[in-house]
């Protein structure tokens, strides 16, 4: 997904 990085199973870090 553009501009989005996913870490682990439930953790989400949104990078703009």
UniProtKB/Swiss-Prot annotation:
<dbReference type="GO" id="GO:0002250">
    <property type="term" value="P:adaptive immune response"/>
</dbReference>
<protein>
    <recommendedName>
        <fullName>T cell receptor beta joining 2-2</fullName>
    </recommendedName>
</protein>
<keyword id="KW-0391">Immunity</keyword>
<keyword id="KW-0472">Membrane</keyword>
<dbReference type="GO" id="GO:0042101">
    <property type="term" value="C:T cell receptor complex"/>
</dbReference>
<comment type="subunit">
    <text>Alpha-beta TR is a heterodimer composed of an alpha and beta chain; disulfide-linked. The alpha-beta TR is associated with the transmembrane signaling CD3 coreceptor proteins to form the TR-CD3 (TcR or TCR). The assembly of alpha-beta TR heterodimers with CD3 occurs in the endoplasmic reticulum where a single alpha-beta TR heterodimer associates with one CD3D-CD3E heterodimer, one CD3G-CD3E heterodimer and one CD247 homodimer forming a stable octameric structure. CD3D-CD3E and CD3G-CD3E heterodimers preferentially associate with TR alpha and TR beta chains, respectively.</text>
</comment>
<keyword id="KW-0675">Receptor</keyword>
<keyword id="KW-1279">T cell receptor</keyword>
<keyword id="KW-1064">Adaptive immunity</keyword>
<comment type="function">
    <text>J region of the variable domain of T cell receptor (TR) beta chain that participates in the antigen recognition. Alpha-beta T cell receptors are antigen specific receptors which are essential to the immune response and are present on the cell surface of T lymphocytes. Recognize peptide-major histocompatibility (MH) (pMH) complexes that are displayed by antigen presenting cells (APC), a prerequisite for efficient T cell adaptive immunity against pathogens.</text>
</comment>
<keyword id="KW-1003">Cell membrane</keyword>
